[in-house]
Amino acid sequence: RWLQIDFSAVVQGYAEKTESEVAPDKIVSLFQSHYLETQNPYQLISYELSRKDGEDSLVVDLTYGSTRLQLEGHAAGVVGAFVNAMQSHSGSEIVLVEYSEHTLSQEAGADAEAVTYVQLNINGQRYCGVGLSTDILEASLRAILSAINQPLNAEI
């Protein structure tokens, strides 16, 4: 429901800007451009995960514009470790508010695409993100970056 509320504002804004009804194919396009194609300024390159004594350590390679970064975070879960890494790097207060995931395919198997939805509170403002991948961890990291990129893209 929280993502529907967030996205409805995007669709409403487009409808008001164009002063027209929004066609179904345009709604799909708006969703893709707002949540799935927000790969700037942060973009995921790779990640490495390790676990010891119940704590996950995550090393992520990212680009921020044309700058390559390697960040590390630690927490009692992969998502928490990534939020920790991004918070330490950015200096922003980042809190995971909502998290949901599911497969997009009815078929089981290694090639099933997963989607992850997140809502983050970044410095007191809420932003939603969506990530897609055949790797559920990668989908989660992409969703977090999608949300983090939202306010940064608004500034550009």
What are these regions (language model features)?
Residues 1-156:
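Terminal or standalone catalytic/regulatory effector modules within metabolic enzymes
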